[in-house]
Amino acid sequence: MCYVRMTPEEMAPIGRERTTKEWLDIGRDAVKEGLAFLLLTGGEPMLRPDFAEIYLGLTQMGLSISINSNGCLIGEKIRALFRQYPPALINITLYGTSRESYGGLCGVPGAYDQVVDNILWLKSQGITVNLNSTITPSNLNDLESIYEFARQHNLPMRPTLYAFPPVRRSNKAEFSRLDAETVGKLIAKDMLLQNGPETIQDMVSKFGTAEAVSPGCGMEQGERMACFAGRSQFWISWDGSMTACGMLCEPIAKPFEIGFRAAWDEIVKKTAAITLCPDCTDCQHKGICTICAAVTSAETGRFDGKPEYMCAVTQNYHDELIKLAKQ
């Protein structure tokens, strides 16, 4: 995880990283059960000294592999590996567009030059690159230039504007994210930049029907999860715990202890029982809200809680879309 730095002594009571063999064994078991597409992520997956061995082994199992990376560690060894066994996709997180931005947010000014060089190298090899960018108060001023970088290099760019509260943080730790009004406006702006004014106008033209629904559904139970999590998607963390999604802390199964199939069956069963906030069922903004079990859990500590911050984000998103449609 990006925000965790522990000594081996601090990590011992919590869990341990799984070995090369363990990862390859669980990968083999997952392939037998039908796994075809795999994402390797972290933190930074290339920090593991055995990354190349794990990646090669999984690739040779026939998996289509994507990678999430900050783009700093694609040195000669990794380049040689990718030349022979290119990933299906690599998502690079771009934190800014200058040495100053990387110095301020990441503490490593020179990382910016490394990241740009590696992005250009990946493109030169015909490897599909997507740009991600996590926007915080520290790099908000870089957002326009990140879009411009993506346009110049003909790269898809997806900004992460909603920041999950890090539920595993210390209670004393500060949590820095944009206010709901700013996030809502930025999501609308991203929709405009990515899809054009016609899409905005089409979305707004449908608001009338949705808003005719009376708020408050009167139900005691909310809707079930509607995403792929726990249906055709799972996540295994650094210590070997399986969840339905990387942003969920529960339910948890232990595939390295009970076997992959048993763990998957457990996740499917428990995920199917999750219900969301009843107030969301007939909310007038349901069609544009990105509410999910991970959001409600992180924001409220329960799956059926009402995430007021996300409600405010969506209201501001809605209002900004209307303004953009009139321009």
Task: Walk through the language-model features, giving the residues of each.
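Conserved alpha-helical substructure of the radical SAM core
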Residues: 1-89, 190, 324
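Residue-level signal for well-ordered alpha-helical positions
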Residues: 2-5, 105, 255, 295
